[in-house]
Amino acid sequence: TPANFLFTQWKRLPSLISHKREEDGITEEELVTMVDQAENEGGLDEHESELIRNAIEFHDLEVSEILTPRVDLVAAEEDSTMEEVASLFAESGYSRIPIYHETIDNIVGVVHEKDFYAARYRGETMLKNIKSPVFYTTGNTKISELMRILQRNKAHMAVVVDEYGGTEGIATLEDIVEELVGDIWDEHDEVIEEF
């Protein structure tokens, strides 16, 4: 059946994309065509075919295509008071906030909401004492590579730097996963009702 053939090819996808061996002879475009054909013939439903298409395109996407730009960042200055940071967490709904030194172009760490409130409860008053290291990347890094780096380092966020070393934005593990599986709703996302 078309679905069986497609899933056989699906299992071979990583080697097809990264090694393009002569004997295989299947391009990404041909694989997408097979997915479309399987969907049209009823072998795949719309969601399955979308997931497969996203997986095929996943290796081509760059961090610059998924980042949150610097103008939309919620970040705290390293010398911010605990009350100011608590307000940022409450107003933004984010679980991690980048910490910068003097300017947003100098992000020096990230603080997790859970760690922040635990430290605040213990009486900690210095934000720089509870920040975690942050990872840096460039906009032309493939998101599949950034995902491996974040997973290897058990991190959820990377600062995307521009060609001058300034902050272009941030990319999160959630941003990467959403490119593969679609939007992930959480309790802080705005609900939009369609009529």
Task: Give residue ranges: language-model regions.
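Hydrophobic alpha-helical segments of integral membrane proteins
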Residues: 1-14
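Soluble cytosolic regulatory domains appended to membrane proteins
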Residues: 19-195
